[in-house]
Swiss-Prot record:
A Gene Ontology biological process term: pyridoxine biosynthetic process
Identification of the protein by name: Pyridoxal 5'-phosphate synthase subunit PdxS
Stretches for region Disordered: 276-302
Catalytic residue list: K89 (schiff-base intermediate with d-ribose 5-phosphate)
EC number of this enzyme: 4.3.3.6
Sequence positions that bind D-glyceraldehyde 3-phosphate: R173
InterPro entries to which the protein is assigned, alphabetical: Aldolase_TIM, PdxS/SNZ, PdxS/SNZ_N, RibuloseP-bd_barrel
PANTHER family: PYRIDOXAL 5'-PHOSPHATE SYNTHASE SUBUNIT SNZ1-RELATED
Catalysed reactions listed for this entry: aldehydo-D-ribose 5-phosphate + D-glyceraldehyde 3-phosphate + L-glutamine = pyridoxal 5'-phosphate + L-glutamate + phosphate + 3 H2O + H(+)
Length: 302
């Protein structure tokens, strides 16, 4: 006699379900929001999901201090305001912030380097949560470590809050280049690569056989214009996270719509030219080259 299937387990919490939810966001734009009003603007602009946080990354940079999870009073307001999925950011290694966000009902948790890390050595063990996680990565080995911990989605770290897409491009190219390298290696060479890069061997082999990451891979960090979003899609990303680029712009509604349209038409230069002329002035931005090592967020959590 076959074992009885637990339908509640199938609906939520399994690795298959968590990765499936992440795949449902593919081809879309996820926007950072700090309150219900911004969440409404994001949904009206065509976002596939919103990400709740205390402040957008550009404001976190300006303000300094300790950046934490969003106010627990604000999260339910954001969830109730929109019909699209609502996500929330937690600090790296802060298991309790993640548990609170899950209890509040968020659809996904971003263990984010944008917030002040709670643990300099360890990330959250994401396998035991029912909510899926997204994590940032600068290269393939970081991405595979996060997937091994239970991440259902990877995103480039980029350099959040700068409006400079340079590092997001760099990180995406790093990941794709390493995957191409692995595809051409023998079993023994992949095992050696896994040891040398402190990456889980099983995932190294799986990635090489698939020719891509085992989970969806979004772009994030410094995306500030429709052209930036289209560029990251050109480089093979599955979708886009954007925060300061929308609500730091002169006209957030128009910029949000334009970025969504750019993702939908990333391979049509004529359409992109029309889209890029509509949203008005973007955020001011700060060049990555001007940042000191201490000002870089991407180095948090390896």
């Amino acid at each position: 006699m076959s074992e009885k299937t637990d339908l509640s387990e199938l609906r939520r919490g399994t690795e298959l379900v968590k990765r499936g939810f992440a795949r449902m966001q593919k081809g879309g734009v996820i926007m950072d929001v700090v309150d219900a009003e911004q969440a409404r603007i994001a949904e009206d602009a065509g976002a596939v999901a919103v990400m709740a946080l205390e402040s957008v990354p550009a404001d976190i940079r300006k303000r300094g201090g300790v950046a934490r999870m969003p106010d627990p009073d604000i999260v339910p307001e954001i969830i109730d305001e929109v019909s699209i999925p609502a996500m929330g950011k937690s600090r790296i290694g802060h298991t309790k912030e993640a548990e609170i966000l899950e209890s509040l009902g968020v659809d996904m948790i971003d263990e984010s380097e944008v917030l002040t890390p709670a643990d300099d050595r360890y990330h959250i063990d994401k396998r035991h949560f029912t909510a899926p996680f997204v994590c940032g990565a600068r290269n393939l080995q970081e991405a595979l470590r996060r997937i091994d911990e239970g991440a259902a989605m990877i995103r480039t770290k980029g350099e959040a809050g700068t409006g400079d897409v340079n590092q997001a491009v760099h990180h995406q190219r790093n990941i794709k280049s390493s995957i191409r390298e692995l595809v051409g290696k023998s079993y023994e060479e992949r095992e050696r690569w896994a040891r040398d890069h402190e990456a889980p061997a099983e995932l190294v082999h799986e990635t090489a056989e698939m020719g891509r990451l085992p989970v969806v891979n979004f772009a994030a960090g410094g995306i500030a214009t429709p052209a930036d979003a289209a560029l990251m899609m050109h480089h093979g990303c599955d979708g886009i996270f954007v925060g300061s680029g929308v609500f730091g712009a002169e006209n957030p509604r128009a910029m949000g719509r334009a970025i969504v349209e750019a993702v939908n038409n990333w391979d049509d230069p004529d359409e992109l030219a029309q889209i890029a002329s509509n949203p008005g002035k973007g955020m001011k931005g700060e060049a990555n080259a001007d940042l000191s090592e201490g000002e870089k967020l991407q180095t948090r959590g390896v």
